[in-house]
């Protein structure tokens, strides 16, 4: 990789700064909408809080943002980029060779990130719309929570509905809008603190520790469940590394953190000034002059939509990476935008919409949603910490230092997990159930793939070259196709699945001019597109290894078209002149792709557990994208052949011939 690429990745720019604000910080930047509200309501309301409680709460928020977001994610995790890409699956690909069990934290972390993220649009949009209760002229309408729910659902329907068309056209405004949003947070927060400058004493961690053990804190350690809301977007910050570059995050985070902290301090100052006023509005909106609240709600709604959009796009990317790592079922992926990074997965989009909408309908208020929010993301952070420890060791950090550093973060995050565990009974169970369902699907898919690798027998292609040559030249068989292409998941050296040779020679002898054996390998580099060809000393058998990055589409016909042209131009593959064609000078014949589907046989090698895995995987396949769609074969000639999973052992069942009576008497 060239130094210029590394420099560009680590370099900051004005444009990159603005783009980072719109892509990276949506989740963490909208936390001020509901974090202080959650703290105050769980304490019993504005009139129940004391100065020490407020100082302690702000101190806890500041040091949570510092320890988890700044130190762990910005200063440590951002260095763990996989060819400029971040996120838990990118981190996993960096360390997976160090231990086979690391697939477990990767799957758990990915599942919890997806499940908890489904709550983000519900919480942020609902919190923003509830701000209308503080707007003169509209408050009487939105005091009725049903109107809040209806407005929220309309916004969500539009947001999820436009995903299929791509979001590039609105993505251009994300950065400027979020710059205005953060600037407003900082400026309004600063002006609110002018009357209570003592709030800045919260920078001292003494107030944070004092509150945890103070009798004024009605919830004890469980207050950290609300504090954690301030940093739930830290994992998304790491996941979006590839979109904006490390340098732009390094430069933009201090600005974002300053604005967020000022917003929290401003809300805290307003609470101290109005704790006897009896006002029950969200401190975020109540701390702003009433004549500005309408504009603030509009801005907050835009910020909430941007945060939700970042979550949706991140979910598509996360699922896409999991599919290419073979730990998630294949779903149809489309690219509505001009670049590969802008993808759309219809099934995931509408599942997210259903979960988000059900969350709004079931919990109704943002306060109830906050009670369930953040539980699963603590698990994601713990899983990231485990993987980071291995990454630090791989990069040469002394093991004792790596263990100590990650043990510290694991302890902090485990305390947050325990504090958030109370949320399980207040709706967090829904998120946990969703996460467990995703982990179950991932496990079934991964385990099923391993079982296939364990049992399917392989044969050496070289041993069958002569038979294939004779079949090619045998005019007694009609020409099946000019080019026959087999896609194989398992092709090492010249060993190939027995089922493929069985298809060519036994099931129905397939006479062709050229036989192609294509293996697609997903690389750790996100945007690789390379190939390797072996003609096997012939001009009729071609082994192709396609090396595609885990973020590249696996549209095999496109790549194969380029490979054929390269081979013909180099003289390694004879031209295939067509007698009948509407394209003058066409020298490439027709292609047929043969896909082989392995189904569970009744062979005794499979244990009951393995049979359960394979049968469950087969059931899941009914709702997933077919290999034909996944490999971009919709417009190609395709034949699907079904073979039993185990071909290596045909069981002989005992059976006796019935002897006619007259024969036995004779």
UniProtKB/Swiss-Prot annotation:
UniProt GO MF annotations: potassium ion transmembrane transporter activity; symporter activity
Main localisation: membrane
GO cellular component, one term: plasma membrane
Keyword field contains Transmembrane: yes
Pfam families with a match to the protein in the record: K_trans, K_trans_C
Catalysis performed (reactions): K(+)(in) + H(+)(in) = K(+)(out) + H(+)(out)
Membrane topology: Multi-pass membrane protein
Bilayer-spanning residue ranges: 16-36, 58-78, 100-120, 141-161, 165-185, 221-241, 253-273, 299-319, 343-363, 373-393, 399-419, 424-444
Keywords (A to Z) from UniProt: Cell membrane, Ion transport, Membrane, Potassium, Potassium transport, Symport, Transmembrane, Transmembrane helix, Transport
Compartmental location: Cell membrane
InterPro entries: K+_transporter, K_trans_C, K_trans_N, Kup
Function per UniProt: Transport of potassium into the cell. Likely operates as a K(+):H(+) symporter.
Family statement drawn from the similarity comment of this UniProt entry: Belongs to the HAK/KUP transporter (TC 2.A.72) family.
Cited PANTHER family: K+ POTASSIUM TRANSPORTER, OSMOTIC STRESS POTASSIUM TRANSPORTER
HAMAP family per record: Kup (MF_01522)
Listed name of the protein: Probable potassium transport system protein Kup
Organism: Streptococcus pyogenes serotype M2 (strain MGAS10270)
